[in-house]
């Protein structure tokens, strides 16, 4: 049985012209206008990419720091010892630990947004794969969260870093701010994401790489966006 959308959603959707592809500025203005959440909703961009995710070299994954931040307070934990632990604390990590932190998570604590680890801690952190992996919290070199440069990793996480990853169908969804952001700040973040996605196009891709782009707020309808307007 198909899920029926609520009246607020339907009213919002009526304000989006069917089959119209909007320029970036108009799309952002419309998403802000039609948002009906009673909280400061997140705004997200979704890309449909022409990639074969069965091929390892076409599975995109990484991270970037948004120029205007995410509008979210990020809780960061770091698995490190010695000088690296001190550096993580100095950089503003919320929790720093070794085996004690591993055990705390094994006992069920998951009140954090980003986990960072130094390479020498990964043998211990690896035991948390079944817990952190499904939640997208497992430290990974591709997202800069397995590193000896913990200061930079903590700073990036605290200052607007977002991660991206293709799903099995070649879709990539990335948050780029809050509805309360000025349109210019949302535009700056959105352009940064689009430029990154285009830049990391796998060499093996043939034909149109970015097939579709849309943006939406947490509960709002999606608005199709012209890719060229994001790269201008």
Curated annotation (Swiss-Prot):
InterPro entries: Ribosom_uL1_bac-type, Ribosomal_uL1, Ribosomal_uL1-like, Ribosomal_uL1/biogenesis, Ribosomal_uL1_3-a/b-sand, Ribosomal_uL1_CS. Transmembrane segments: none annotated. The keyword Repressor applies. SUPFAM superfamilies: Ribosomal protein L1. Keywords: Repressor, Ribonucleoprotein, Ribosomal protein, RNA-binding, rRNA-binding, Translation regulation, tRNA-binding. GO terms for biological process: regulation of translation; translation. The keyword 4Fe-4S does not apply. Signal peptide: none annotated. Gene3D superfamilies: 3.30.190.20, 3.40.50.790. GO terms for molecular function: rRNA binding; structural constituent of ribosome; tRNA binding. CDD domains: Ribosomal_L1. Binds directly to 23S rRNA. The L1 stalk is quite mobile in the ribosome, and is involved in E site tRNA release. Part of the 50S ribosomal subunit. This is Large ribosomal subunit protein uL1. It comes from Levilactobacillus brevis (strain ATCC 367 / BCRC 12310 / CIP 105137 / JCM 1170 / LMG 11437 / NCIMB 947 / NCTC 947).
